[in-house]
Amino acid sequence: MRRPLLGLLAALVVVGAIAGALAWLLNDPKPPTGANHAERLYYAYCVTCHGVDGRGSWRAALFLIRPGELPSAARSRPERYLFDIIKHGGAPLGRPGMPAFGYHLSDADIEALVVYLKTLDRRPAR
């Protein structure tokens, strides 16, 4: 009688650990309080792959994807290039392609995101 209870207890611990890990993995970062429209867009559409600071996220790494480092890309690329990559997607420098967001975001939203991306290199890494 004791052995089946021990097995059941062990199974419950394993299931609880897996559920806790999944809850942690699936918890998306939230924008800071008082975030402007562009920052909220970044958190809604970009942070999963590019991370909070724009330097990539562990979620993308799980799928062996290395998204571009946004602070240096935003600093070195023209705004039109960034706009086009966000709107139409693409595979710059032979990397896996970024999906197109032109169907989800208006041109004004994409322009606001581009302006926000230009501020990432001035933010401390988190």
Residue ranges, per PLM feature:
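Inter-heme linker and motif-flanking segments adjacent to c-type heme-binding CXXCH motifs
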Residues: P31-T33, R55-G56, T119-R126
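The canonical Cys-X-X-Cys-His
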Residues: A38, Y42-V52, M98, L113-L117
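N-terminal Sec-pathway targeting helices
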Residues: M1-V14
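Electrostatic cytochrome c docking/interface patches
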Residues: G16-Y43
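Axial heme c-ligation environment in periplasmic c-type cytochrome domains
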Residues: L62-E69, H88-L120, A125-R126
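Gly/Gly-Pro-rich "capping" loops immediately C-terminal to redox-active cysteine motifs
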Residues: E39, G51-D84, F101-Y103
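Hydrophobic core
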Residues: V13-I18, G54
